[in-house]
Amino acid sequence: MEVRIDPSWKERLQTEFDKPYFKTLTDFVREEYSHGPVYPPARLIFNAFDLCPFDKVKVVIIGQDPYHEPGQAHGLCFSVNEGIPFPPSLRNIFKEISDDLGKPVPVSGDLTRWARQGVLLLNATLTVRAGLAGSHQGRGWEEFTDSVIRELNAGRDGLVFILWGSYAKKKGAMIDRNRHLVLCSAHPSPLSAYNGFFGNHHFSQANDWLVAHGEKPVDW
């Protein structure tokens, strides 16, 4: 089926778009958008892919679900629109970057700047009904985003996969650790940040790996 997404991804993922589950998923998502607020806005569902073409990916950060409150989600995991207060997990991410790299906490929680540098900010589920966390889980998005991870694993070398929390860590089973760096820790949520997220040094480790593999480090 026809999906509006960056051409480099379209070429890689067309077989997924043509599978029956994806049509069922698309029908469900269209129905949801027609009945009330769903996040992110429909035009931004594939924002992570559009900002970060397949051959430009250097780092993959895996989230679970889009934010479900108004104005927050814009298709990049953990990121919020300009001018929106930082959700707790994002605040903790910026704290870790500050502690790890000595960078000041930014004024904006919009991580588009990371995506443009090759950081794929991938939620496992790409849509959510307003106010209902997890409401679009188990509808097919996970099958689709797993195929994205497998495609990156097989089609690229020397990537960094950052997996926070038990949900994301399970995705590590699809990644060849002989060819890619896999960084795992607790989730940045306030419930777990002090149990292994703070002090994980993932941002400096990712940059060290990229430099060692001839890539430009990310300006986190």
Set out the residue ranges of the language-model regions.
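Generic N-terminal amphipathic, Lys/Arg-enriched alpha-helix
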Residues: M1-L13
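A polyanion-binding, active-site-adjacent surface
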Residues: V3, T15-L163, Y167-K170, I175, ...
